[in-house]
Amino acid sequence: MAALTTPRISRSIPAEQHGRVVAEILALAATDPHITARSARSLRRALRDDRLVVAFDDESVAGWFLSEPCGPGVHELGFIFVHPSVRGDAVFIDMLNLALAIDGRAVSVTFRADFAGWLIRSKGFRRVTLGEAARVSRGWFLLRRLAPGRLGTALRRTSSGEAWYLVYDRPR
């Protein structure tokens, strides 16, 4: 994957490209144990609903940021991946800004205190309890982690450090 100086970032991907984008994401996920697998079906749904922010290096997928709906006006900022060839603050920030624009309110979790602090200081997130994250997401935040395919991943991650549950409210 040859790095361009500025990857193209979009969440409005033409329908005829959905199959290729999903295949590339699944191929990248299969090679990296840190990527939480998502089904082809859920990725296609996210693409169809403009809830998958994708970074392209030339025409290849170089990163993605998944937004999972939690009801009207609320979404969970799911997994983000940026390929090392294009990794940098600008790509990540552009992807994050595009993801935050999807709904007025977002919930997220990280186990990296430094990253959580950056989100709080620079983007206006606030730290909340697990109960508050569940309430804001109308229970979806917990339900997703209890799904059979994701429970093992959730348990491994929660045992790896302190969880920082975060909520973002878009400024009015």
Regions found by a protein language model. Give the residues of each.
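A conserved beta-strand-loop-helix scaffold within acyl/acetyltransferase catalytic domains
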Residues: P33-H83
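N-terminal charged segments
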Residues: I25-L52, R145-G152, R156-S159
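Short alpha-helical
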Residues: R20, P72, D114-F115
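Conserved GNAT acetyl-CoA-binding A-motif
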Residues: A101-D114, V128
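Conserved catalytic-core motifs of GNAT/GCN5-like acyltransferases
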Residues: R126-R156
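Conserved acetyl-CoA-binding loop-helix of GNAT-fold acetyltransferases
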Residues: V82, R87-A101
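Short amphipathic alpha-helix that is part of the acyltransferase structural core
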Residues: M1-R38, V54-F56, E162-R172
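Conserved active-site tyrosine of GNAT-family acetyltransferases
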Residues: L119-R121, F125
